[in-house]
Every structure is written in C-alpha cells, then in structure tokens.
Amino acid sequence: MSVSGYKSDDEYSVIADKGEIGFIDYQNDGSSGCYNPFDEGPVVVSVPFPFKKEKPQSVTVGETSFDSFTVKNTMDEPVDLWTKIYASNPEDSFTLSILKPPSKDSDLKERQCFYETFTLEDRMLEPGDTLTIWVSCKPKDIGLHTTVVTVDWGSDRVERVVFLLAEDKISSSLTSNRPYSRSRRAPKKDFAVDDYVKGSRPSKVVERSFRNRLPLYEIPKEIREMIENKEFPDDLNEGLTARNYANYYKTLLIMEELQLEEDMRAYDMENVSMKRRGIYLSLEVPGLAERRPSLVHGDFIFVRHAYDDGTDHAYQGFVHRVEADEVHMKFASEFHQRHTAGSVYNVRFTYNRINTRRLYQAVDAAEMLDPNFLFPSLHSGKRMIKTKPFVPISPALNAEQICSIEMVLGCKGAPPYVIHGPPGTGKTMTLVEAIVQLYTTQRNARVLVCAPSNSAADHILEKLLCLEGVRIKDNEIFRLNAATRSYEEIKPEIIRFCFFDELIFKCPPLKALTRYKLVVSTYMSASLLNAEGVNRGHFTHILLDEAGQASEPENMIAVSNLCLTETVVVLAGDPRQLGPVIYSRDAESLGLGKSYLERLFECDYYCEGDENYVTKLVKNYRCHPEILDLPSKLFYDGELVASKEDTDSVLASLNFLPNKEFPMVFYGIQGCDEREGNNPSWFNRIEISKVIETIKRLTANDCVQEEDIGVITPYRQQVMKIKEVLDRLDMTEVKVGSVEQFQGQEKQVIIISTVRSTIKHNEFDRAYCLGFLSNPRRFNVAITRAISLLVIIGNPHIICKDMNWNKLLWRCVDNNAYQGCGLPEQEEFVEEPFKQEGSSNGPQYPPEAEWNNSGELNNGGANENGEWSDGWNNNGGTKEKNEWSDGWNSNGGGTKKKDEWSDGWDNNGGTNGINQEGSSNAPQDPQEAEWNDSGEVKNGGTKEKDVRSDGWNNNGGKNEKEECCDGWKDGGSGEEIKNGGKFETRGDFVAKEEDEWSDGWK
C-alpha cells in the first residue's frame, strides 16, 4: 500500500509537515495485519498493533494504549533511518517514542523523562542491530483510529498502517466470543416423505369445516419439472393479459413456492439427536430463537432414522412448544416407544403452504371479476363520478382529501379508485374519514378494510375508534385475526372487537360476520371471509390500505372473492415506497414483484391523473420542511408541500445539535461491521454505542420521551443488540426495527444506523442490491418517518457511494449539521429519474448459486441457512416477530398430503395454532358467550361433485368437464397450454437498475 509520494530529507525533518490520509478499509489493507520478513528488503520492519482474529485491536476511549515495532538492519553497512507518523485519522491521535510510554503506575521521574513526537529523525542503525520504536494512541472518541508510519532509509521506504478500534463500555459489552463461521453443509441426503406416519397434533389444533374449502393446489408434477428445467408455458412469453390472468399468476406463484422450498432445505439437519422431555421429544434447532427457521405451535417436521436403509417410514412430529432454540414435539406413540438416547435422525423442515394456497385460489377466483377491476384500460367508456358535498368529521382535511372522499362516496363499482401520495400526506386518515362517512351516511354500506400487517390493521381500527364527533357501535365493527396471532400482543382497547376462544382467535360464524358494518383485517386473513361463506357483493366497499406493499395475488384475496361489478374498490398507497417481498428472482422479474396499485398506473386513466379514477395527495403533515426537501426532489418531482405547523419546538430544546435551525444531524462514525456464530446478519458495536448515546442525550430533555424515538437499521443483529442495550438501561419504549416495520408510522425523532463500514462488503451488496444503502425505496421510507429530527449515524465513506445517501450527507454538511470523522471527496453522480416500474423486494442475484473460496456469497441474495445478509430470514416477508400479514409462518418446503387437513382451513380459521401459554386471567371478549350460543358451523364444507380437490382450475374453484388434467387451461377455452419456451438462465435476465428495487432486505 502506498499513501504518500516521495519527499526529500529536508521535508521530513520538519515535524509539523504531516500528510493526509482518507478512509482506509482495513479489510483491504495488507500491511496492517502481519508481514513476511522474506518479502521485505534489507531493512525489516515489524507491525505494531497487529490484528487479532483478522480484526483491529480494541482500546478504551480516554486511555493511552501503546505497542512497539522493530526495525532491523540486515545489511553489512549502517543505515540512516527516518521514522515518521505520516498522517493519522483522527488527526494527531498517534505519536512515536524511543522510550516505552509510562503506565498508570509509573513514578514522576519516569513520566518526566518520557518524550513523544511525530518524527524520529536521523537514527543510525548499525549492521545486524534492531531498533525498538513505540507507537501510542490516546483516543478521544469511539470509532476506528488509523495512522500511517513510514520508515525511510536512503531512497527506500516501508509503510505500516495501524488500525485501532476505540470503544466505550457499551460497545465493549457487546463484544462477541463466537467467531463467525459460515456453515458449509454437505449435500443433503435424499429425504422422501411420500410415505410417513402421522404425528400427534396439539389438542387445540383441530380441523374446522368451512362452507368454502380451500383446495390443496399441489403443484402438478409436469409444471414443477418445467419450471425446474427453466421452461414455462406460453402465457409467460405472451405477458399478462385478461385471457391468461389466472394461469400467468399461478405460474409465478409456483416459481415463488419452489424458491421457498429450496430456501427451506438449508435448514434441514442430519445426524442429530432428540431428548425426552416428559411426553415430548425435544430437538435443538440452532437459530430458532432468531426465527431461522420459524416454527410455531402446530407446525410439523419430518424425521427419519439417520441410518435407515430405506425400509423404515418417515415420521411426522407436531410442534407443541417452542422454548428458545429448543422445540418440543409429539410423534406417533410407536416412535416415542422406539426412541432411545442414542438414536440419531435426519430432519426435514416443512413449508406451510396455507398462504400460498390462498394466493392460488385468489387468482383463480379473479376470473369471476368484472374485467374492469383488473384491466381498466379495456373499459369501453370514460366514467364520470357524481359527487355530493359532505360534512367532514375531521376538521383538518384539505381540498385533495375532501375531493377523494367525495369520489369514494360517489363511486359505483369498477374500475378501482386510487388514493396515492408521498409519505405523511394523510392517505390512511383519508380512508378513515371515508369509512366513517360511509358508516354514518349510507345506511346499507358494508365496508371491509384490509392492510398488509397486523400493526397496520390495528392502526386503522384505533383511528376509527378515536375519531372525534362520531361513535361506532361496538357490535357493528369487528377486527378479524388469524388464529396464529398472539393474544398477548393485542392492546386491550382492540381485543374487545375480536372473537376468540381460550385465547385463540377465531373467525365467527357466518351469521355473526354478516351483522357487522365494518370489518378490519389483513390481506391474508380476509380469506377467512370467503371460507366462512360471505357472498360476493356483501361488502359494498372494499378498501385496501398500503396497497403497494402487497403483491397482486395478495390484493386479490379480498377483491376477487368478495366483489361484484357494483362493489367499490379503493386502493391507498404509494408506489414509490416499499413493495411486496418476493424471493424468486424469476417470478419477480415476470411481474410478481409489482403490486396491483403499481400495475394500475400503467393504465392511462391513472397515470394521467384522471380525477374519476385517482387522487394524488401532496400536502405533508408529518415532517419538518427541511426533512421533506430532499425526498420531494428525488422521488416526487418537487411536488411535496410541507404543511406541518410548529416545526421547531423540539429543535429549540436540544442544545447538543450543531445547527438548531436544521432538523437533521449526521454523525460520521468509522466502526467495524461484524458477524458472529453462524449468523450472517451484520452488526456494528460502535454505531450501537453512538445510537445509545444519542438516545440518552435526547431523553435528558423533557421535550423528548422514549416513545417519541424510533431507531431504523437494516440488519436484524443490529436491531437485536440495540434492543439488548436498551433493555439493560430500562429504556424499552424506544422502538427499534427495520424500514419495513416503520412504513406507515412516524416518530418525533428517527435515528438511522447504517451499520456497514467496509468497502469490500458494501461493494458486493451494492452490486447485487442486497444492502440497505442501494435501495431508493427504503431510503425514501427511512428518511420520511421523522416529524421533527432526523439523526443519521454511519460511515460517510461508505454511504457516499450511493447517489441518494451522498446527497443527504452533503446536505447535512452544507447546513453545518455534520459531526464526526473526516469526510470523503464529494462525488458526482449522473442524475437519473426515479423509476416506478418493475419494483422488487428481492435482491439482484449474482450468477452462481454457491460460495467462493473467500467465503463470499456468489448467489441467491440469501446467505447460508437461507437468510439474506441483513439477517431477516426469507420466510414469508415478515415485518415483525408477530407481524405476518395473517399471523402465519412461511417456513419451508414440503407439502401436506391429501388426507391431512383436506379442507385447508385447519385450526379454526386457516391456522396452525399458536403457543397457548399466556395469561389465564386476560380479559374475555364480551361477545364470546353470544357467539358460543349461536354456534359455529360444523359441517358446511362439503364439496360439489364437479369440484376438484387439487384446486387447479381456471374458474374460481369450480372445475369444468373440459378442463385438462392439471387444471391449466388456456384462458377458459378448455385448450391445454402447450409447454413452450425456455427459461433464460439467471445470468440472461436483464438486471434492473438499482433504483427499481424496493427492498434489498431479504
């Protein structure tokens, strides 16, 4: 490595003449860790502060640390040495000395004799002699400290780069004793489960018969083989049309399901033992506490004796309890009897297919819809909505919001109406006002409101309940939950609007469901309404909030099963924020990564802003104007209008801000990104310490409370370790999570920890869109969550590689709002418009699905164990621990057999159940006794004779005689699809631009 040009002796003799060094990536520097004396010249220079376990040594802030290096003359003649601190970062943080620096116990005389400097001049070293030189560092701040020491003799030079990581008590407490080691697993043995012995289900996981049973939708063998061979039906070559809609999306869903199966195989275990735990057998599953894989009460796995010669059966084991990394299961009684302490097994984890089957059914049922719901461009004539004035319940509505509500009240069926706009423009509040107006002014209105996650659905319900000026009757509003949702996680003010039995959420019987005027649900849980038998057209209005976050099949669960032509469908969202989470690159590239909302904007009526189809909200009531300025210019053509009042009240009280007039601050930190154990997720202890310090300084002022603060960070390990420290400090009200967990939410103060601090890994992430820093949609969401103050903590030399982050960095610098390490050179980027089409939440994959010799990921977006490098495992797109869009896990491969849960709607509403160990004295639903008295449907799921059990039909679930054996028919014509076309290899797909990816997060 060379960091400086040659200088004359005269120049070196001037102590004050020091050079400059920019950011040096310690992982790319070969001179700092060790040296080979055989590669050196006649003067051999050792390395001070050598790396330990391939990382810089740690030192304590405020204390002097020192180490020596030696210079040996191997020549036959003396040499004249000039040794110098060429440069340090931070400046003047390192010194040189001939004497060993004094320690804390040194006497006064020893301290007085010690002399340190930046340059040791004109030292004559005789042949064979060795000179010992001491390097000292006294760090004032946490972070990486770097210096370059040069040793010159004659015209030759040796450079040594020193890296030290200055830490405080918080960062030191997070030091891991588990070095990172990627699990290099041998190829798994073939593990067939076609023939298995059923296990013992938990007592509360019982079958529930529904009027409309969910078909199995087992993947046809020929379709599976086609896709695995990179072949596909002609429909995919043709593109999405009204004729091939169901077949097109079912093929994409098969691709996605096959990818999930493949990902789950990484979790399979071989040659493992189980322990007796009373009536259970327990299996230790590494990573289970971090939901890798995710298993809950009622799920099942398959095991087979490791040394089975093929004559024994596989055994199914149901999960009865999950404790940390240990899962307690029950198998068939014969398996428990045969088990011994020395028994060794191979284990296969299973992918719960319920959600995927719901998606298959939804796109099948979409063929029953009025075509104008799916393809408004085919609409024969332009519609005109007749509007009537209304009296707003909320006094804060602006003109655009009032206009959009009038349109919703005046709509008469297809096509859908869209309310879209940037963050903080009041989309959800507009929906809430529309719901209340329908409730109070239209006597026969029945409204279904769906959101992508439980927290988002709860948020809507809370808004409805606290709206002043109107009271919704308790018996006219209902919150539908999946049975797997934890009872304990729901707020008391919401639980009274839910239906449950023994702390298990259930879907009420049909008679009860149809009495409600307002039903709030997630997209996935809305499938229970169709299962219970709610007719098409029962709901006069179906409102989809945050519609851009869901895939089109998810949106179709509510729309395709419950709409008639006159049903009013309203979508609210922002296609420039986060979209659906997709794991199959092939499926994403062909359209599964595009939301229903985004696809509608391909129609002229929507993209041209026709007020009879769409309203755009542009007034932001959330953020300080200075916070809005950059995202408005980058993503919304400068149309955002800052409309928040009282923007400076918090800023005025924070004395530590470098610029009180500017609501942002960037703390430049050079830390080390690390991993531990077999977990591929990154964390940065130095940034964690700075996050905690910032939270303490904020809460020291009464104007900012813990609940006012949110911390956004892209890596699961960073989230967990920040929470660990906050728990220790009893500061549990601070919310910490990923960007996905904050979409649709806001906090007075947002702190962003970017984590990455090495160019080597960041460049790899950027190349394949795996990381947080290369994702414009994530960037957009992250920086628009803050109401009053945005704090960014990160390495400026890393984030400046991305155009959007670079602009944010220099905006802070230009407004005197930057503090911390030295800045990089300002980079110039070619301006590119934000691309709305082709969004994706899966990363761009490298070409080969393997790891190279250096231990770097070569493919898949997913790291070992099927997990993305951010640590958020790829099991269904979870947003929080209990934030599955319907409460379901999506954890693996494998399928259920036809004789098992044949209706598909197991455990009282399509769930596998939850861990029931919870509060036994929790408040009971006041309506529970009423539901029990009215009874539940016990036998409503009988199939018609002409309905196939596999579900592969093309007409909403009713098989017709002319349908081909696999259910794949050509747009309803009854003709079999010809197996044409070839999948291009992954390397042949045209890679999307970085700003098209809406998620890089696993």
Curated annotation (Swiss-Prot):
* Gene that encodes the chain: SDE3
What protein name applies here? Probable RNA helicase SDE3
Its lineage reads: Eukaryota, Viridiplantae, Streptophyta, Embryophyta, Tracheophyta
* InterPro entries tied to this protein: DNA2/NAM7-like_C, DNA2/NAM7_AAA_11, MOV-10-like_beta-barrel, MOV-10/SDE3_DEXXQ/H-box, P-loop_NTPase, SF1_C_Upf1
Observed effect of gene inactivation: Delayed loss of transgene silencing (post-transcriptional gene silencing (PTGS)), with full silencing in the cotyledons and in the hypocotyl, contrasting with a loss of silencing in true leaves. Impaired maintenance of tobacco rattle virus (TRV)-mediated silencing. Reduced methylation of cytosine residues in targets loci but enrichment of histone-H3 'Lys-4' methylation (H3K4me3) at the same sites.
Entry keyword set:
ATP-binding, Cytoplasm, Helicase, Hydrolase, Nucleotide-binding, RNA-mediated gene silencing
Q: What class of enzyme is it?
A: hydrolase
**Pfam families per UniProt:** AAA_11 (PF13086), AAA_12 (PF13087), MOV-10_beta-barrel (PF21634)
Residues of the region (GW-rich, involved in binding to AGO proteins) are 871-1001
Bias (Polar residues): 913-924
**Which regions are flagged for Acidic residues bias?**
993-1002
Q: Changing residue 427 to A: what effect?
A: Loss of helicase activity
Per the Swiss-Prot or TrEMBL annotation, the motif DEAG box is positioned at 545-548
Which residue ranges are recorded for the region named Disordered? 831-1002
Give the originating organism.
Arabidopsis thaliana (Mouse-ear cress)
User: What subcellular locations does the record give?
Assistant: Cytoplasm
